[in-house]
């Protein structure tokens, strides 16, 4: 049998299985949009600085995503921002599946200026109104600040002409350096393509829609609800575990358990 992996950030397992000569990059965007610009700032007074950056975006009716290391920090930061007269909401795994799309819709509509979370962009969120992704404590090595996670997270600011990333860090870790180099490489490729083809980057216009599922459908999984093949799920779980993506592996494990209960 043959398998085709499709990923913006393939893990080591996929790369190993594919072999370098069989990996095809698809980096060019027809819209001409570039990868975001990147800035590194010290962690001292990072929250104070973040507040000023959020206010700048708010004046232009733009949104911000802020990434912390823990759920507790996400909630605490969101509460503090609210006290500072910034419309903020936190979002992490404890938010029910059917609540998440509602919060994201409200962010896009402007009810919130900023969304605070842990790994918001690992699920491929498409939020064209977001112009700033702020990663707090970016130099704390670990899964949430790995090269792959940083690339995925920074890519969340690539849906807007003014996309920008701020990494709050006192040192440049290996993961940070590799992620920054990769984003810059992709940005350079797009700039050259735009120049050769006389393309002027265009903003993404995306309609804000209501979540299509009714509230009674409480058992929908946000990522795997259409997958019926148990063996495929088990393979995905193993790949996630090998790539140290334990949160993803746990989600798939729970889904397999639910499907088994449904067969009993």
Please give the residue ranges for each predicted region:
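Conserved beta-strand termini and adjacent loop/short-helix elements that scaffold enzyme active sites
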Residues: 41, 91-93, 117, 168
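Conserved motor-coupling elements within RecA-like helicase/translocase cores
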Residues: 82-86, 90-115
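N-terminal cationic and glycine-rich segments that engage phosphates or anionic surfaces
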Residues: 1-61, 72, 78, 103, ...
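C-terminal catalytic or substrate-handling cores of phosphate/nucleotide-
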Residues: 69, 74, 80, 84-87
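Short, surface-exposed connector motifs at secondary-structure boundaries
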Residues: 56-64, 84-87
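Conserved RecA-like ASCE P-loop NTPase motor core of nucleic-acid helicases/translocases
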Residues: 62-70, 91
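Conserved H-loop
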Residues: 8, 69, 93, 119
